[in-house]
């Protein structure tokens, strides 16, 4: 990877019929393992680029620097249709979703969802949503993602891949205090990893990210533990 000018790596997705793979960036373990330091972002210790690969040649064809709008691009997902050229990447710290289309030799990359940061008195900067996971339903109809700090999971209709439309939102834990108790219990942490059932009707959500980050942002989780929550999804009308 050093010969390819790739400083960090994290997630990847590939479409063999398109001879294409997309990879993302996080940071070096020595940066994120102790916890999150905002100053590390300004020191370029976290990634902000995505890379498009030629699978056969095992070479990077194109690298996109997502800039300030694309800080820490972790998860990437493409549509499940093996002939599709559409995909998404979630910029965790910037809390934006980018759409990409690899149909042309020069891929198109565009921000299509912006989760606004919120001013709060307990955080030194406007609180980002912190998008930690994204997924596409098996029928390629919906995009889901989790905002770990805000505390919501969202569902978007992606029938038109480059123009997602919000169709559902559920609150689970989070720092904004908007989430209800579940079965009489306050949920520690926020929606982090998500997995959808094959029929698309149940979204499973866990609330722990990484122990040092859990302790930093959700200290109550150390004693109360994390949780797994199931969210019922409307696959016909959205929501």
Predicted regions and their residues:
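Short, conserved, GDST-rich strand-edge loop motifs in beta-rich repeat architectures
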Residues: 24-45, 100-102, 206-225
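Short coil/turn segments that connect the beta-strands within blades of beta-propeller domains
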Residues: 17-19, 83-85, 139-141, 199-201
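A detector of repeated loop/turn-to-beta-strand junctions in beta-rich toroidal repeat architectures
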Residues: 44-49, 94, 150, 164, ...
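Surface-exposed loop and turn segments in beta-propeller and other repeat-based domains
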Residues: 1-7, 60-71, 107-127, 167-186, ...
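Signature of short aromatic-glycine-proline-rich micro-motifs recurring in repeat-based ectodomains
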Residues: 7-11, 72-78, 123-137, 181-198
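Short loop/turn segments immediately following beta-strands, especially the blade-tip
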Residues: 52-58, 99-112, 155-167, 218-220, ...
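Residue-level signature of beta-propeller blades and closely related beta-rich strand-turn architectures
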Residues: 27-28, 93, 149, 159, ...
